């Protein structure tokens, strides 16, 4: 048999098989088929035929000429796929041992590559597929890595036996694990170029099947005989037979991921295209189309980590539509393919985030998270139903629960040095991160993508994403009905991330792309509030939770580092715009004070020493004639100390600027940023120049933020006309705190004065002058109110108020105890507004325990201390994340003096200056614009009736102008101010829950007369507020009379006002406006009703200063015969109208309705 075989090979040596192929295609095809048929005659001897073919191939190659044998070998494999191994094996053996070099256009490689073209041999479609599969199977199994060794003694490493192959493999593993050997040993898969060109020529179906087989996904090429080691002519390289991994299917490829990566990398390196990558990733991630006959060959989703570099390249070049289909296909895959598709999607994001630094020649786009994931998630959630919608929501929850997936971690910027660290080195991690431009661009692009996902799919999707975000951060329980999450998330909840400043930093960029007042902005603000609260809980833990403390020397500075870093970043760094930074700092201050003032809040940082309340309250010193309480360090003190230190430090730095400028010439300082430091251009001078430039920018920013905080701009969301009154109250308290912080710090005022003199920088000088003027004007206003408010409060102490409510503590209340009176009224209003008693009790305990500084009598305590405890009111209606309490606000305000005056003064200025807002059609409330300020002032009066109402009376007496008709702009402004003042007084008198405020307002008889003067000077706009004031006055008379002898003098004053305005009110009965006529009728009814009190009713006097007062007959209201006066005024008005020829229709109907019919 052997001799026979040798004869047929020998007989071919001088045949046309080794000649160039004929030019005629038909003749060529005939010769090829003839030789293929001839070869087929000798395949029966399965042992000898492979050896003969190998001998034939070894004698033919390498060859530089095109011969017929090239296409005969390829066509033989096509016709006899079962013998493909016998043909391919000798060729690849020559490649592995270095005898034959691969060339795409060389021989016989070009013939085998053309075999894979879908246009050839169409009549053999089934055999063609089998042949392609066999060729790829053999090439892949022998495409083992070979290491090029530079050391001479390693040239002969491994032989072709299996034992030697195994030992060689172990040596390779050791070499891979040894760092010092890595530079010398470079892995190379010698058959990858051939496989790459074959796959590029093959149709997509062949490519996909190949990648699934290599990845262990599907056994498409499971058939085939035994594989043997390649035959090597020389001992170069390490050709080995494949060693299958125990964990892979029988038909899988050892290290299939390495084969796939090698093939795809080869294409990129040689052709700079990624067509194979585009085919490989969907083939690996998506379940293959199967039939019942081949379902058993599907193994499922392969491990993703080995393909990280492949995914990185794919997502760098893929279109969003392609990646969206890929993501949906993965999320909707059946459990048989991916038991946990959600975990697979999350792992894919993790791999891409970790692969951002790959130096593969193709970098991910900066907005890859948006293009390939967030955009698809938003689209899926907009479908509202289906597997993709639910799994996309779950994927979003998982991504948000792991913030490092959403934004690049800060490790990208490690090792970066900063040359300028202003203000004591408070340099945040954000600044260090932004030193890497790629990180900044990625954060910005991702933030823009988040904003797009939130706003591009409608309000329903936006609301759902917001609730998912809050649930992922632990702000909402997963079981809440507001959180619409798939069962897969609720059943296996994740631990929420630890809220911190570094976690929230990237979200600041999202703010810049969100519409003002959107639900998304409110969501981010709630997350910010929760973040600040979490920082404060860590920095200043509650008293009960601090069981074990570290030594103060070790942790004192670390305890407040995160809080100070956050404050520093917002004040001077560019992590947020100036407008956003001022809003966030507003929240920081209010949350700090709320944490410090609420029950259980600690004012000591972690690691500080314990002090008893007696030590704090008793240790005081007299400063500037005022008793100032020495307070412990708390979050507000941390905020204040930073502001004071920053302003003073920047002022000192800028004062040095003119001295180091060129020749000290101030005329050259117009453009302060571009000043050139004199002297040689050295590193020191450049560093000094950078330091001065930074100081100028920081000063501009911090002054702008302080000016914004002082301008009563509420914190968070909404347009300027939709702020709640509670937010306006909080804004006023923040402004008062900032004002008094500067007023009580002489160095800080000196620093502001110095900044005013920086004429070389117009912005700094202007802002400093504006801020200094606002603080000075506000301080003078508060001082004036303090001095003038004492007579009004003294009048209240001489007018005890009787209430029908049951007493809280004692039946007899000392009239001089105004604080107890306010506390009693506050408690009653709390119950009316639905606040729980325990919260009020806690607030009272805070005051009684000395944690909140209090004032007594006429003593004026430190306003800086009071402001720290008082600015604790945070909105509850729109920003549910705020933990402030209105109950606590009222309880603390009732004990304060100057701060209450300060807040009233600021709110008054806002009342006067607020623009008039047009009512919107979709508005559900008529209270907009300046009317919200009226509500805010009413809240302050409810919290501290005596002091707040006294301050309002003083401000109203100063700003109320005469009612003179003028058509110019100044006249219109004057009327506008008067209307608002009258509206405010009417609202305050309508609130009968604050008797002290009612007494003070009713006692201001001159103010009430001026407020109701000139009722008919102008039209309806001015008459209506004045009639409202008369209406509430008439109702107040009825209430005050029931107090007994204590209310006689007050009722007399109000009755005199009504009598003075009676004739004008009767005249309004004939007004052309129906609204005015109706309101004047209401006023007259209330006047007549108050006159029906039994004049003979005797009211026993109360104990006053321990002395029983004599019996007094209360005739305050009934001594006036209102019925007769009304009838007389109606007759006079009728007579006047007859005399002038005016109609009596309206007047006659009103008189009849009032029981005072006109006589003909």
UniProtKB/Swiss-Prot annotation:
Residues 158-188, 600-629, 800-830 are annotated as: Disordered. It is found in: Nucleus. Keywords: Biological rhythms, Developmental protein, Differentiation, Flowering, Nucleus. InterPro entries: GIGANTEA (IPR026211). Signal peptide: none annotated. Residues 170-187, 801-812 have a biased composition (Basic and acidic residues). One of its GO terms (biological process) is regulation of circadian rhythm. Residues 158-169 have a biased composition (Polar residues). GO terms for cellular component: nucleus. Induction: Expressed with a circadian rhythm with the highest level 8 hours into the light and the lowest level at dawn. The peak of expression in long days is slightly lower, shifted later and the decrease is slower. Belongs to the GIGANTEA family. Involved in regulation of circadian rhythm, and in the control of the photoperiodic flowering. Acts as a suppressor of flowering under short-day (SD) and long-day (LD) conditions. Activates Hd1/CONSTANS gene. This is Protein GIGANTEA. The gene is GI.
